[in-house]
Amino acid sequence: MAALLAVAALGWAAPAAARGPRIPATATAQATVVAPLTVVWVQNLVFGKIVPRPQPGTVVVSELTGSCTVTGPIIQVGKCQYAQFAGMGSKNMAARISLTSVANLTGPGAPMVLDQIKLGTNSTITFAGNGNANGNGVGLTKGANAERYTIITASGIYVLNIGGRLNVNANQAGGTYSGSITISVQYQ
């Protein structure tokens, strides 16, 4: 009987011994806190992956939807997205917003020109200036300077989306290209 109990005890001990070591895993949590009278970066302007051809072409990211359209023989695949910034003022506060009109994306080959940079608005901020901006009063066009907007949310937090046109050169060298877009907000 004692031998039977010893075997039974070993049977219960075996599963505990079969457990492997505890392996930790971690995740990153991130939050952006928007302070009053500021503007902060949220996401980059992305044109996806581009296959160049012997002729030039363009990839346009919409400031309203973040979707891409292509002209010319080049091929674009992958995710496109508009750049996004967030800011905080107060409800009905005016803000003059200006941004880069042209930028160069540099990398291993000839620079690519980013132009027709446009600011798209949404339900958090409304255009309150020149009705001819971007043809319909919802954005800035190349050469526009410090257009006036009104913050319309009760919290004063607003979001700005930025799109533009990337001019891809004929036979553009492969690699990663980057450049900068600067946005300036003057609260009034």
What are these regions (language model features)?
Residues 1-3:
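Bacterial N-terminal signal peptides that target proteins for export
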Residues 120-166:
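Acidic, glycine-rich flexible loop segments
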Residues 90-138:
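Contiguous segments within soluble domain cores/interaction surfaces
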Residues 17-108, 146-188:
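N-terminal small/polar-rich segments of proteins
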